[in-house]
């Protein structure tokens, strides 16, 4: 009897998961998971997973050697060739604007970014910074090829660690969907 109950629970759970994944693709699009690249701040390899028609998770891993440096005084402009590593993760809500020859969506979300310096800055340790951000952007999906998306995103936010400071991330990128 316990095996029957356990098997029923497992089958029910698998059915719910399958229907949730299917709902992301049954809304008139075959895209659910995309990978790509983003230029500017942060320059990154990026991914996006649709949870349903309007909700998605966006993430990225970036490396760069220009732009902003981070220390105990907050972000500052630099061009000294130091290398930085960045991780970002956002929840996005999307709505279509145009859905004709191309599909144009706008999105807004909430998330964060961590940046790590890879150099010694004189204070006895490598620095890390934490950024709370609100990404706002446009996503352009082509009908042919239907698996390609281009986007522009602006993400104003606050550096929480080190000391509080306002900053804006700007990204221009492309994704291929599978």
Residue ranges: model-predicted function:
Residues 29-39, 106-112:
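Transmembrane beta-strand segments of Gram-negative outer membrane beta-barrel proteins
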Residues 33-49, 63-69, 81-83, 158-167:
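Solvent-exposed loop/turn segments connecting transmembrane beta-strands
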Residues 38-40, 62-64, 111-115, 153-159, ...:
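Outer-membrane beta-barrel pore domains and translocons
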Residues 28-30, 73-75, 155-156:
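Extracytoplasmic loops and strand-loop junctions of Gram-negative outer membrane beta-barrel proteins
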Residues 1-28:
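Cleavable N-terminal export/targeting peptides
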Residues 49-150:
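Gram-negative (and chloroplast) outer-membrane scaffold detector with strong preference
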Residues 25-28, 115, 150-153:
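Flexible, solvent-exposed coil segments and beta strand-coil junctions
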Residues 166-178:
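Outer-membrane beta-barrel "beta-signal"
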């Amino acid at each position: 009897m316990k095996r029957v109950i356990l098997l029923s629970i497992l089958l029910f759970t698998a059915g719910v998961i399958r229907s949730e994944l299917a709902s992301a693709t049954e809304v008139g699009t075959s895209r659910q998971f995309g990978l790509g690249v983003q230029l500017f701040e942060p320059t990154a390899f990026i991914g996006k997973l649709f949870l349903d028609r309007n909700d998605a998770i966006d993430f990225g891993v970036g490396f760069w050697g220009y732009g902003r440096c981070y220390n105990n005084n907050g972000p500052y402009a630099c061009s000294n060739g130091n290398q930085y590593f960045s991780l970002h993760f956002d929840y996005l809500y999307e709505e279509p604007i145009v859905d004709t020859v191309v599909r144009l969506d706008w999105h807004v979300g909430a998330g964060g970014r961590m940046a790590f310096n890879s150099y010694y800055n004189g204070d006895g340790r490598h620095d890390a910074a934490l950024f709370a951000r609100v990404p706002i952007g446009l996503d352009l999906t082509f009908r042919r090829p239907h698996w390609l998306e281009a986007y522009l995103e602006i993400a104003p936010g606050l550096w929480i660690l080190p000391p509080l400071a306002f900053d804006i991330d700007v990204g221009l990128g492309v994704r291929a969907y599978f």
